[in-house]
Amino acid sequence: MVMSCTDPRTLIQHLSTTYPEATQLAPNSVGALQFVFPDGLVINIYPMGTIHFQGQASSIRAEVEALVLIMNKR
């Protein structure tokens, strides 16, 4: 699934703080920052706010989707 976030920097800060167990990988050649969670979920966040979810079903994904929807309403 693909989503768009109006404030990717705040999302990245939130994920780093809320999910310290996730591995945060440095931006790749196209600038995407990647979070890899212990349950197999992978979230790629691109500089312009595009978010790609990969991996198996995860309750974290639902939490992040809800957060992005709230952030986009600001």
PLM feature segments, named:
Residues 58-74:
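Mixed-charge, Lys/Arg-enriched low-complexity segments
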Residues 1-3, 48, 71:
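Detector for methionine-enriched segments
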Residues 1-42, 64:
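Short Lys/Arg-enriched alpha/beta "domain-start" segment
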Residues 41-63:
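Intrinsically disordered, low-complexity regulatory segments enriched in Ser/Thr/Pro
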